[in-house]
A protein has these predicted regions:
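Acidic/histidine-rich, metal-coordinating catalytic segments
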Residues: 111-124, 149
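Extended, low-complexity cationic-aromatic segments
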Residues: 15-98
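Short glycine-/polar-rich loops that comprise or flank the Walker A/P-loop
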Residues: 29-30, 80, 110-112, 140-145
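Short catalytic/ligand-binding loop motif for oxyanion handling, primarily in non-cytosolic enzymes
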Residues: 41-43, 122-125, 155-156
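RNase H-like two-metal-ion nuclease catalytic core shared by retroviral integrases
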Residues: 70, 118-119, 146-160
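Short Lys/Arg-enriched helix C-cap and helix-to-coil transition segments
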Residues: 1-15
C-alpha cells in the first residue's frame, strides 16, 4: 500500500536506540525527558455555561467563538512522573529555544539531560543559536544528549 511506511535498517536502528534509552534505570543525574508540541484552537463560549445543580449536570453550549490558535509544548519525564507544559503563541524556533532554556533550568543538578524528540525543523541547535546567541546555545546544547525519534519514509510503490 502506498501509505504504509517502510521500516528500513536505519529506522529500526534508530528505534532501538530510543527503546534502549527508555529501558535504562532511572537516574536523577541523567533524566530522560520527551518533548513534543501540539497546535490548539482557542475557543470562547457564546453563552455562559450553567453550573451543576443538585440532580442536574453542568451544561455547556456546543456553539463557540473561535479565538485564534496557540501552541502547547509538553515535556514529560516518564520514570520520575514529572511533566511540564508551556503555552506559546506559535510554534517557532524562538519558542523552542525558550522551552529548551526552561528545560535545562528545571534540571540544575543533572549531568546530562537525555532529550527525546522528533525531527521537526526547529528541533535543532541552530534554533538556540539564532535566538539566544552562540554562548548560551553552546551551554544549553552541551547539557543535552539529543535522541531523535526515527523518521519513516513512505514506501515507493505504484497505485493501480
Amino acid at each position: 500500500m502506498w501509505c504504509v511506511a517502510e521500516l528500513d535498517d536505519a529506522y529500526i536502528a534508530q528505534m532501538e536506540d530510543v527503546l534502549a534509552l527508555y529501558e535504562k534505570p532511572y537516574k536523577a543525574a541523567e533524566p530522560v525527558v520527551c518533548l513534543d508540541e501540539k497546535p490548539i484552537v482557542l475557543h470562547a463560549d457564546l453563552r455562559p455555561p450553567r453550573p451543576a445543580q443538585p440532580g442536574h449536570l453542568a451544561k455547556r453550549d456546543n456553539e463557540y467563538k473561535r479565538c485564534g490558535t496557540a501552541n502547547i509544548f509538553a515535556i514529560v519525564e516518564p520514570k520520575a512522573g514529572r511533566h511540564f507544559t508551556c503555552a506559546t503563541p506559535d510554534r517557532s524556533a524562538l519558542q523552542f529555544a525558550q522551552v529548551i532554556r526552561d528545560l535545562v533550568t528545571a534540571y540544575p543538578f543533572a549531568r546530562t539531560i537525555h532529550l527525546v524528540m522528533d525531527n521537526l525543523n526547529i528541533h535543532c541547535r541552530k534554533s538556540l543559536t539564532d535566538h539566544l546567541g552562540e554562548r548560551e546555545a553552546n551551554y544549553l546544547w552541551s547539557r543535552l544528549q539529543v535522541q531523535y525519534t526515527p523518521k519513516r519514509q513512505l514506501a515507493q510503490s505504484s497505485r493501480d
